[in-house]
A protein has these predicted regions:
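A membrane-topology feature that recognizes alpha-helical transmembrane segments
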Residues: 1-160
């Protein structure tokens, strides 16, 4: 199997993992550590197969993930985001160029806003008490899938 085929298989595996993350977040408001770890550990395989240079490419991906972890850990600390969501975003940051990841964050913000509005409407219709618990993993997964769809349409060698 050539490396480009394997790269597409990795993208497909990432897409499946994102769907699993969304489903489990809807069902239990939890994204498993093993799933986030699998996403993170598959990224270096992707880097090697796509021909990324150690410097600056691979180190840049690790740096991006560190920045994302730092920013979103702050969101977790103030209760604005769950830990699984933070880890999922950090793992996704290992897969994409920082400009592509900024697009993912923009799409995630829009999808998260729509999801929150839908949850608010649902709560009002059902007349339930308590705070709204938004399964933000759904917005993260949606934005990840949207981004993967765009990347997969390009040559796997040109995304970095």
């Amino acid at each position: 199997m050539d490396s480009e085929t394997f790269i597409y298989l990795l993208w497909g595996g990432l897409a499946i993992a994102l769907i699993v993350a969304a489903i489990t977040d809807i069902k239990s408001r939890h994204i498993s550590n093993w799933l986030n770890l699998a996403i993170a550990l598959a990224a270096p395989v992707f880097w090697i197969l796509s021909g990324m240079a150690f410097w600056p490419d691979m180190i840049g991906q690790i740096g991006l993930a560190a920045v994302i972890l730092t920013i979103f850990a702050g969101m977790f600390a103030i209760g604005a985001m769950g830990g699984g969501d933070v880890k999922l975003l950090t793992a996704l940051a290992l897969w994409m160029h920082w400009l592509t990841f900024l697009e993912l964050l923009l799409i995630m913000s829009i999808a998260g806003g729509v999801l929150t509005l839908l949850m608010m409407i649902s709560k009002r219709i059902q007349k339930t008490e308590g705070p709204i618990k938004v399964p933000y993993g759904v917005a993260i997964a949606f934005s990840g899938l949207w981004t993967i769809w765009g990347i997969a349409g390009q040559s796997s060698q040109t995304i970095f």
